[in-house]
């Protein structure tokens, strides 16, 4: 059974955080569709679309791990990026519940979404192209910490914090000043994982992070 206060916003959406069987909903997807237009080859050709995601509705609960299984190209990565608003959905609602109230992610401004990104992180599938080759491990992990105001640049406490995150992700402290090209693919993936977890996010999309 679902229990929730019927607190409605101007759009008629429930803004109070839903609780289902005693579990708090963190993210709620309602009929989410993600269509990409196909380039026309003829002047009067009817617009066609690739339906990457077509009518997805689900709840993701606090503390829950949800796995999406499917063949290559079925839309798993697209759904993850759509939730994070890297691709705003073509249709439907994605609500993120913070401090007990729902936030419609698609309606946020760029700056508002930038604040929320601290809570919603992505571990990229490709550990090679997702790391800046000109930045050291410490700089890569610390970039989000400074841009989101967790630490000031040059703060000695930030280095100690990064060391702790690196240790948690299986990276030795002596790797702090090394560059991505000095690591194997698996080690690079650990760097990407550390970068995301350093912000202590509420939700993480792991795009085949173990591959």
Task: Label every model-predicted segment.
Residues 27, 51-53:
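Conserved structural motif at the start of ABC-family nucleotide-binding domains
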Residues 193:
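Hydrophobic anchor residue at the start of the ABC signature
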Residues 200:
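Conserved catalytic motifs of ABC-family nucleotide-binding domains
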Residues 100, 156-174:
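Conserved ABC ATPase "signature" region
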Residues 179-183, 187:
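Conserved ABC ATPase signature
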Residues 69-70:
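The feature captures the beta-strand-to-loop junction immediately N-terminal to the Walker
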Residues 93-115, 154:
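ABC ATPase NBD Q-loop/coupling interface
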């Amino acid at each position: 059974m679902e229990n929730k206060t019927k607190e409605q916003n101007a759009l008629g959406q429930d803004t109070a955080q839903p609780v289902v069987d005693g579990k708090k909903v963190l993210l709620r997807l309602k009929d989410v569709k993600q269509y990409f237009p196909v380039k026309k080859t003829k002047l009067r050709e009817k617009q066609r679309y690739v339906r990457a995601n077509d009518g997805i509705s689900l709840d993701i609960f606090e503390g829950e791990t949800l796995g999406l299984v499917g063949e290559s190209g079925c839309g798993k990565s697209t759904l993850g990026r759509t939730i994070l608003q890297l691709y705003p959905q073509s249709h439907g609602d994605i609500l993120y519940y913070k401090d007990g109230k729902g936030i419609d992610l698609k309606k946020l401004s760029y700056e508002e979404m930038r604040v929320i990104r601290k809570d919603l992180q992505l571990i990229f599938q490709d550990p090679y192209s997702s790391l800046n080759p000109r930045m050291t491990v410490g700089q890569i992990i610390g970039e989000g910490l400074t841009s989101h105001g967790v630490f000031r640049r040059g703060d000695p406490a930030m280095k100690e914090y990064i060391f702790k995150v690196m240790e948690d992700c299986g990276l030795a402290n002596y790797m702090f000043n090394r560059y991505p090209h000095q690591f194997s693919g698996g080690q690079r993936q650990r760097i990407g994982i550390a970068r995301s977890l350093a912000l202590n996010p509420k939700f993480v999309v792991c795009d085949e992070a173990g591959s």
